């Protein structure tokens, strides 16, 4: 759905700690996809403890077992992970109540062009979750990077007006409300432009579409209709329909396997 689930504003720079907090809004059997730098025994332990599955992009120096897997010709194995004694002592000093146990982790490896991707997952059933599905799932995480660009370049999220923590929180929350509102419109538009039939499902990701809504244009269209949506309540239905139909015309063909460098000509915000 590409809808935001949770956000956090913290004074520390520990993204792993924020990730642990985000797990509180999820349910067992949900799946979280992480980029490089997030994997740790503590985060893996929390996922196993909560029943929330994880897919980590692994770095070669994550552990000796992972380093050996990088160097091997194997592409799909299962290991048992237990921190070294010094690492266990460090974990206990910070989390004295944490029970350190051997944890199972599935390691997967594949190559795209000149890049080798190594993933660690708690989805252990190789028959139910084959390697090729992980390739598509991890690639879907690229949408997060695209959202960062949209947030910084279009919503200019880093240009805060408030000078207080509470005010900044409100601005971030308002930003995610706008992202959610635009996603609801673009998801429905994706369904319509690819089916040509009245839609009955709320899930636009049933099949890989051949067309997709241009999300940036969607934002600009909704921006032009926002004042009417907020203040002209008697016309809200007509405005929603007009905005939606306009968004449906702002689409482009899906371009799979894009590998060239993207460069924006837009000046950086000061």
Regions found by a protein language model. Give the residues of each.
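Single, function-defining residue in the core of a domain
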Residues: 1-270
């Amino acid at each position: 759905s590409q809808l935001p689930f949770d956000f956090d504003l913290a004074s520390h720079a520990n993204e792993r700690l924020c990730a642990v907090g985000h797990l509180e809004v999820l349910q067992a059997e949900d799946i979280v996809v992480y980029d490089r730098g997030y994997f740790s025994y503590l985060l893996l332990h929390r996922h196993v403890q909560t029943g929330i599955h994880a897919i980590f992009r692994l770095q070669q120096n994550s552990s000796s077992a992972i380093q050996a897997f990088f160097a091997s010709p194997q592409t799909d194995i299962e290991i048992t992970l237990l921190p070294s004694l010094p690492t266990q002592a460090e974990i206990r000093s910070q989390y004295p109540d944490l029970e350190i146990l051997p944890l199972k982790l599935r390691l997967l490896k594949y190559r795209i062009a000149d890049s080798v991707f190594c993933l660690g997952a708690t989805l252990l059933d190789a028959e139910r979750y084959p390697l090729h599905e992980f390739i598509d799932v991890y690639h879907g995480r690229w949408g997060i990077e695209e959202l960062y660009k949209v947030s910084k370049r279009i919503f200019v999220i880093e240009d805060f007006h408030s000078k207080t923590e509470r005010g900044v929180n409100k601005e971030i929350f308002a930003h995610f409300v706008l992202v959610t509102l635009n996603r609801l419109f673009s998801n429905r538009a994706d369904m319509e432009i690819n089916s040509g039939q009245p839609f009955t499902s709320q899930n636009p990701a049933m099949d890989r579409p051949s067309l997709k809504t241009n999300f940036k244009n969607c934002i600009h269209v909704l921006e032009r209709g926002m004042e009417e949506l907020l203040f002209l309540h008697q016309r809200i239905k007509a405005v929603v329909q007009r905005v939606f139909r306009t968004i449906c015309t702002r689409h482009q063909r899906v371009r799979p396997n894009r590998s060239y460098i993207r460069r924006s000509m837009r000046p950086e915000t000061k």
